[in-house]
Amino acid sequence: MALLQTSLIWVVYAIAIAVLIAVASVFIYVYQTPRDRSPSVTLTCIFAITTLLATVLLLPVDVALVSSTNSSALGRRKDWATDHEVNKILFSLKVVYYLLYSLDALLCLLVIPFTYFWYEEYDEVAAEEGEQTTGNRFWAAFKYTITFIAIVIVLFLVGFFVPVAKDNHSGGLDYFKKLLTENRGERALTFALGLLITIGLCLYVLYTSTGLALLPVSLIKTAPSISAPNLKATTAMQLDSNRERQRQLEGRCGGNTELLSSKDRRELDMLVREERTLIRRQRLADEAQGEGRSWLMRAWLKTEAVFRPFKLLGGIILLIIALVIWVSMLLTAIDKATNSFCKYHCGYILGHITVFNPINWVFVQAAKVFPVDYVIFTLLVLLFFCSSVVGIAIVGIRFLWIRIFQIRKGHTSPQALLLTTAMLMLTILALNYSVSMVVAPQYATFGPQTFCDRTTGTFGEQADCSNARHLIKPCSEMIKNPAASGVCTPSIASTFLNRVTINFPFFGVIFFWGQFVFLGVYLIVVVASLFRSPKLDERQMDEDAEEAEEEGLLASTGRRLDTAWQDITGRSNRQRDS
């Protein structure tokens, strides 16, 4: 029975990974520009996003496996859950976590930078002429990646030798004493994880909070579309007015623009440019309404119009969910600030939850029927992931408030896609801490595990609460009953994260106060967005229309050149045959 249960849990995780591959593939396909696709960039981004999401979604598997050893109805371990069996489960989880975290670090710090420089070093002309070989390109990309290799080495060396916190503020609790690691290898990995979460926290605060606030509002208050009839009518009126003014100016000079004054010539040139822009807008409006397009596209546009009210309903539901998440995070943050037994000395670890958290309660109840909690957790992670993408798309990739790259559907360059992937990886690492320690701390640590708060007379014997159900209590780190340590098994994920904050308290302080900054940024953005009406970005629309026109001209020119070349080669062949 135990083997069947654990096998089913891992099967659900495998199905989730397959779903993640599909989600990552769709994300990359939707955002990358069609005319500048690179297989190496596409595969790297898909693999990196899948790996990191798989790391986060390992948490419900972790909770389900450790909870499977405990009978929450009786508050005791199941008969098959001997120390040997429990240690086997914990060891397998540790191996998977170490593998995924190491892979995440390598992808973010080495593979993505190398792929970036590999793409940058490509010279199409030199490659066609044979001047650039694969070896030359590899060495050029590797030379730039050496800097990142040095960063990784320095990072692990610092983590290897940096002093850890001493056992002065653990309150004498065995659970927290065990987290003070003396293994230098684990210390280096713990330090590296803490540093990456700290960097990701900055991105998480800026982008995820913004996206979480704007994603529901964008569904509720949709910006005007180019396909709207009133915008099309306005464009037609502006075009008629433009052409009428051109006729007036041309009538003054009888068709000879040299007779016009310099002011009128400048105005006429401006009107001609504006006319081209308005014609492009009109063509985009016609295409958006389905004119001149296939019946399938017209059917899709009509279906989209029919389901528009459901889009509004979905936005309202997402807004309510986001507000509940915000309230849950605020309640846990206040609980940590007031009831943490060691405060800043251990990164505000909360030994026992005293304030009700609605999201945490939902997860603990759902965890009793696996995989209900897994489905809810996956949806929660995907909500945060989509919010991060929306935040990056709206804010853009910036350096000192200067936008370097813009992330847009169908217009994202390979370089921007790689940078976005690296940012998402760091953001999701910070999300892993936030979900585990703030959004649902009880669920992420012990899940639905309980213990019988009754002393036993015999060493190794489990307490029996079958006739005293009121003594069955949820597991927590601050349990004073020594018998509970043999019943309650904390998740590996919570152990890793608590080890970071226990060994390096300054990381824990940054993580904790970063949650308040996240909550503040979310509140400011959501209030501002509710009072601000969305507008159509005409400049961006004109750039898209101009780009589409250029691509159409290039395609038609290429077809004409191909036809002319075929005609020439065909005539020469006929002359040889004759």
UniProtKB/Swiss-Prot annotation:
Record GO biological process:
protein localization to vacuole
Region annotated Disordered, chain positions: 539-578
GO molecular function term, any single one: cobalamin binding
Keywords associated with the record: Cobalamin, Cobalt, Glycoprotein, Lysosome, Membrane, Transmembrane, Transmembrane helix, Transport
- The UniProt regions of compositional bias labelled Acidic residues, in chain numbering, are 540-552
Residues bearing glycans: 70, 168
List the subcellular locations: Lysosome membrane
The reply on keyword Hydrolase is: no
For this record, the Gene Ontology CC terms, alphabetical, are: vacuolar membrane
Tell me how this protein sits in the membrane: Multi-pass membrane protein
> What InterPro entries does UniProt report for this protein, alphabetically?
LMBD1_LysCbl_Transport, LMBR1-like_membr_prot
Query: Where does the source fall among the domains of life?
Result: Eukaryota
Q: Provide the primary localization.
A: membrane
Transmembrane segment boundaries: 8-28, 46-66, 95-115, 145-165, 188-208, 312-332, 347-367, 375-395, 419-439, 506-526
- Name the Pfam families for this protein: LMBR1
Entry similarity comment: Belongs to the LIMR family. LMBRD1 subfamily.
Enumerate the PANTHER family for this protein. LYSOSOMAL COBALAMIN TRANSPORT ESCORT PROTEIN LMBD1, LYSOSOMAL COBALAMIN TRANSPORTER-RELATED
The task this protein performs is described as: Probable lysosomal cobalamin transporter. Required to export cobalamin from lysosomes allowing its conversion to cofactors.
Descriptive protein name: Probable lysosomal cobalamin transporter
Q: Which organism is it from?
A: Aspergillus terreus (strain NIH 2624 / FGSC A1156)
